[in-house]
Amino acid sequence: MGLLDKIHNFRQAKELMDIDLYNYFRVIESAQENTVRYQGKEIIMLGSNNYLGLTNDPRVKEAAQNAIAKYGTGCAGSRFLNGTLDIHIELEEKLAALVGKKKALVFSTGFMVNQGVLSSLAGRKDVIIIDRTDHASIIDGARLSFADVRKYRHNDMENLELVLESEKDTNKLIIVDGVFSMEGDIAKLPEITQLAEKYGAVLMVDDAHGVGVLGKNGRGTSNHFGLTDKVDLIMGTFSKSLASVGGFVAGDADVIHYIQHLARALMFSASMPPASVASVSAAIDVMLEEDWRHEALWRNNDLMRARLDDAGFDTGPSETPIIPAVVGEDMVAFKMCRRLSDEGVFVNPVVSPAVEQGNALIRLSLMATHTEDEINQAMDIMVKVGRELDIIPG
């Protein structure tokens, strides 16, 4: 079979298109807010990572516009060469203070952070240890490092210790999601930090979904547990609570200096553009000044979770405003997603191999700016469609 033959044989997406159940690359015609314009009508958005509701905030947009006026639309180079602006440095200082580390380094995307950090820190004689449900960027970054990759069962501390014990004579890096992006549960950081210390492993937390959601004023998972000093590296993204695009890693000054000079994803990629840098900086300011957003996010989480539980939905181990509704087979998830959008709710289907076969789910995520009426309206629709598809009892 020729290299391109597999392209002609790739039918999965087209088969879904043929039966009008393709739920990817959907075109939204408005800003990402609690409601969006989709296929010509306003529907409730329960599929966005805009946790604090800041992507369309006037102050964040004004900061981006001012940055374009001063610096232009791009940096025309990598951070390593001509692409570092004074606002990059200012943002890095703000991020380091936010997560309680000495120094931070900004990348153009969150995915690139994990690629760059893992491939620069670990090598062929090292071991990277990951949770089975860690984000794809962690898996790809670990592969790029050429280190041996060991997986442990999801949030299973006994299994993690078995892996660590079997690798006690090697250099080890544990990397774990602070908040797991599909399940919505939180890493068992108290136990993980103890095991990392016991077995001499470096510990990195991917806090893409933790910053803005957990900790004092949204400072993240490590802050939430009071374990910032026990975590060597904290990674985060700007495409969720911080209303933009990009990512960062924060840690000891010498470690960040090392990554600066060896992370190919940083050195050979164009710098994060001025508008994005300024919008993140403004979003951090708003997040720290307006704690009501954090409180509202968790109040909305409690309401939605109660409605789902009362209706009989299986929400798995979720502990955060990422709430999965387990529906079973992949095709059921596709059907439910389509029916919900028809009825006025935008959600995301998560199917195998992202989850195990038979455990497909509808991934629901909340914003601080959702109103009680919007949540109740969306939940009424969820219950209606769930009963139609025999996911919950009638």
Give, region by region, the residue ranges found by the protein language model:
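Conserved N-terminal alpha-helix of the aminotransferase class I/II PLP-enzyme fold
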Residues: E62, N66-T109
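Active-site phosphate-binding strand-loop segment of PLP-dependent enzymes
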Residues: R150-V205
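Conserved active-site segment immediately N-terminal to the catalytic lysine
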Residues: G200, D207, G220-F238, H257-H261
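Conserved PLP-anchoring active-site segment centered on the Schiff-base-forming lysine
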Residues: V117-A136
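Conserved core segment of the aminotransferase class I/II
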Residues: L233-M235, L242-D291
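N-terminal "arm"/small-domain region of PLP-dependent enzymes with the aminotransferase-like
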Residues: H8-T73, A201
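PLP-dependent enzyme catalytic core of the Aspartate aminotransferase-like
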Residues: P58, E62-N66, K70, A97, ...
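Conserved PLP-binding catalytic core of the aspartate aminotransferase-like
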Residues: E295-M304, D309-E343, A354, N359, ...
